[in-house]
A protein has these predicted regions:
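Short, small-residue-biased leader/transition segments that mark boundaries at the very start
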Residues: 1-2
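General beta-strand structural signal in soluble alpha/beta enzymes
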Residues: 5-7, 25-30, 69-70
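A short, flexible low-complexity segment enriched in Lys/Arg and Gly/Pro that occurs
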Residues: 5-23
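Short glycine-rich loop/turn motifs that provide flexible caps or phosphate-binding loops at active sites
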Residues: 7, 30-37, 44, 128, ...
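A gly/ser-rich beta-alpha-beta helix-loop segment of oxidoreductase catalytic cores
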Residues: 18-56, 127
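Phosphate/pyrophosphate- and phosphate-bearing ligand-binding catalytic cores of soluble enzymes
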Residues: 61-181, 185-189, 193-208
Length: 208
């Protein structure tokens, strides 16, 4: 069944709307921050689910105002990647292919994912979600923790003491420069200790 949404809708709201319609496939997205357009742009995923599994059609507008429509096979969705990171087009509408399911089972799965997130992730503090991509053969949070960087702070930005894979706004007034500086410091120290270069999962646009 096709489920259509404007790209600006919050991903968690789309996940909730799908659940209320007894449609399964988007439960993994219930706690991922950002819009559904952003989720397609980054091929967001969690708990063995990703947008690649449910995306059916994406409509975009280019710099000249032309509308383009892409089918599932044309999206080039990979680990935190889509074709839209390369072609400069803005996503305006998304159609997802979801399956009819049992509403109680869908809700139970979403509740389980929410509880797991709340127990392990610093959801009580502002952040942009998971900060670094998962390097092949490793987990970014584990490498950062083993380097002893939990609690490391640059200005108002801090490596979360709850989950080292998150950079949080610990003081409430962290700047983009603070976050960028902390990301750079973490990259350097992890590389020096483990020989692994971490790459940001967040997109950095412009100068901080």
């Amino acid at each position: 069944m096709l489920f259509r949404s404007g790209a600006g809708a919050l991903l968690k709201d789309v996940s909730e709307a799908a659940a209320q319609s007894s449609l399964t496939g988007l439960e993994f997205a219930c706690g991922i921050p950002g819009s559904i357009g952003g989720a397609i742009f980054m091929n967001a995923g969690a708990y063995d689910g990703e947008m690649k599994n449910v995306a059916d059609t994406v409509r975009t507008v280019d710099r000249e105002g032309n509308i383009h429509t892409y089918s599932r096979d044309e999206l080039d969705l990979g680990y935190r990647h889509s074709r839209f990171q390369d072609n400069g087009e803005a996503i305006v509408e998304v159609e997802l292919c979801l399956e009819p399911g049992d509403s109680k089972a869908i809700r139970a799965k979403m509740d389980d994912f929410t509880q797991r997130r709340e127990s392990k992730q610093p959801l009580e503090m502002p952040s942009a979600g998971s900060t670094f991509k998962r390097p092949k053969g490793y987990f970014a949070g584990t490498l950062i923790q083993e380097t002893g960087l939990k609690g490391l702070q640059v200005g108002g930005a801090q490596v979360s003491t709850k989950h080292a894979g998150f950079v949080v706004n610990a003081t409430g007034n962290a700047t983009a420069a603070d976050v960028r500086g902390l990301i750079h410091e973490v990259q350097q120290r992890v590389y020096e200790k483990h020989g692994v270069m971490l790459h940001p999962e967040v997109r950095i646009i412009g100068d901080a």
